[in-house]
Amino acid sequence: MSHHKLQESYDHVIVGGGVAADKAARAINERTPDASVLIITRDAEGPVFRPDLTKGLWLDDSTTVEDIALGTADDTGAQLATGTTVTSIDPSSHTVTTDSGDSVDTVAYGTLLLATGASPKTLDGTGGTDGTDGTGDDRVAYIRSLSDYRTLREKVTAGTRVAVVGGGYIGSEAAVALNAVGATVDLYTPDERVLGHMFPASITDHLEEVYAAKGVTVHHGFQLDHLDTGDTSGTSSTALTLVPTDGDAVSADVAVIGFGAVLETGLAQDAGLALEDGGVAVDISLSTSAPDVYAAGDIAVFTDPLLGRRHVEHVDNAEQSGTVAGTNMAGGAESYEYTPLFFSDIFDDGYEAVGTLSTELDVVEDWNDDRTAAVVYYLRDQVVQGVLLWNTWDSVPAARKILSASKGGTLSVDDLPGSIPVGDGE
């Protein structure tokens, strides 16, 4: 919880403790170093580089918790209220109400940033805030915060049977991370292939082989109905039981849930801010419909110059939009005109991407000769909507140029192969 009593007012208040909040605080400090800034987060600790919760902390023995802490308060002078929830926003009076568990406070702001991000989608389909889905069982993990990571890491040692439920972005990474520390990992996906909603069969077939070779057992067509945590009243806990909608139940020592995420828009909605496509609508300055209230990161629905109105739940967008929002909160006049990238590594393979990757779109694949690297284009009505750079590096600017040229009608489908040099697979 907060280490210092809250002031009655601040020049700038930031709700959320992720990367967007960190970047906004830094931008404010750079422009107006004497401004008072309050960052409010329900997390127990300050902002960290969240991608490493499923990447570096597991895959690199030299990466420590201290390494991924962003040092926001120390670097910017912002006051950090951890373990604190914002219960309401009143745009008309320019105030927020907070609850730290010890006290309820009303704080006035000059400008306000909503950088509340997204919460893991829980077993009942809602967004979770405590990482336990209401079961009270810390063997059921959602990897969102540093606390989640610490709890999971304490539970997992070599040979621990871990069920990863969900074959999407988080599930695919979590399986790799847990395998790296010697856990016995079973990956359960309702789909025919891991990441099958994003990647064509040429890639997902390869990934199936890689997971198997590394010792991760993939189970397809597994739709989880409910999870039985058993009797944990004794000194030793029984195994978790995962019960599918169809087929036999399976057991595990720990379950990691990767169902996707739910945007945290409740505060904005209750305050009467304009919502759009499940997120918070912002203009080119990242201002919301309420005066002096901005939004950045996952929840912000912005105008991508190449792809139109969208929200993006990846760290690059959080960093870039947080910086622009913070600059404008401090009196700047920057425009957010950016097409974010995202990235991941799956064992020895990796990728960067821009735009929409969906196998519901038309796909054009361009492979190197030994089929270890590719550039994959995703099209709707012959216009490129996304570019996947599979084991192909330093090509994101080129991918953005492809999106722009295709949108402008100066690049045909036949021109795509060879337009971005394919990597060598290294």
Regions found by a protein language model. Give the residues of each.
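Glycine-rich dinucleotide-binding loop and its adjacent helix/turn
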Residues: T116-V181
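C-terminal catalytic lobe of FAD-dependent flavoproteins
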Residues: D248-L273, D349-E426
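A Rossmann-like FAD-binding core segment of flavoenzymes
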Residues: D34-S36, G77-S103, V107, V181-I284
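FAD-site-proximal beta/loop scaffold in flavoenzymes
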Residues: G136-T160, G234, L242-V243, A249-E319, ...
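Residue-level detector of alpha-helix initiation sites
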Residues: I14, G18-V19, A44, A118-P120, ...
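Mid-to-C-terminal Rossmann-like scaffold of FAD/NAD(P)H-dependent oxidoreductases
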Residues: S2-H3, E8-Y10, I299-S395
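Beta1-alpha1 glycine-rich phosphate/pyrophosphate-binding loop at the start
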Residues: S2-Q79, A177-M198
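Short hydrophobic core segments
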Residues: I14-V15, V107-G117, V250-G260, G322
